[in-house]
Amino acid sequence: MTTKKSAEKKLVSIKKSPKSLGKPMKGRDILVKALVNEGVTVIFGYPGGASMEIHQGLTLAPKIRMVLPRHEQGGSFAAGGYARATGEVGVCLATSGPGATNLITGIIDAKMDSIPIIAITGQVPSTVLGSDAFQETDIMGATFPLVKHSYMIQNVAEIPRIIHEAFHIARTGRPGPVLVDVPKNIQQQEGIADFDVSFDVPSYRPNLKPSILQCKKAAHTIQAAKRPIIYAGGG
């Protein structure tokens, strides 16, 4: 005999286990799988306390090669160089605080030169954000004018969507850097994530059609120039 209580329990179980969901995973492993799904094969990362869980997850991902720079800034520039050389999105990884701020020069370079990179930073646990915790830095605020977009992951279930969005934003329109900040407790937290994600970013609609007026003006300027020089590649 099926009671109302057991029927409700069964219904909840069905709702929590659609076909696109798998077994519970740590946030770090969900993040790594999301990166693999985006085709990432190389990450340039310098480990630290707030990002160590992600590094542990990467040891279980044979498809991703981990390159250890001597300094986080070198990692961000290496990610940019990798993107230039391969046409793929470069990925760099650093811990919180000084590790994250050391990425900034490479992030600025990517913004100025229209290079698609994803900068992933470890962060102090979300439960102590704003308490001046050890090596806590508002890296989202520090890089706000330097990136196309930035995220702080607050729930393991949203990791696949955020990573998918970050790569889409980095590589489309005028390419550029995107920051993904991941608190340590989110890296450690277990949850069930849906990797069959779709997204819609209403505020992000890059205009890929050139202005006819601007094209005519450029053509007239080139035609009238005696010694024209074209400097191309600014995105």
Where are these regions (language model features)?
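N-terminal alpha/beta PP-like core and its mobile active-site loop of ThDP/TPP-dependent enzymes
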Residues: T2-G235
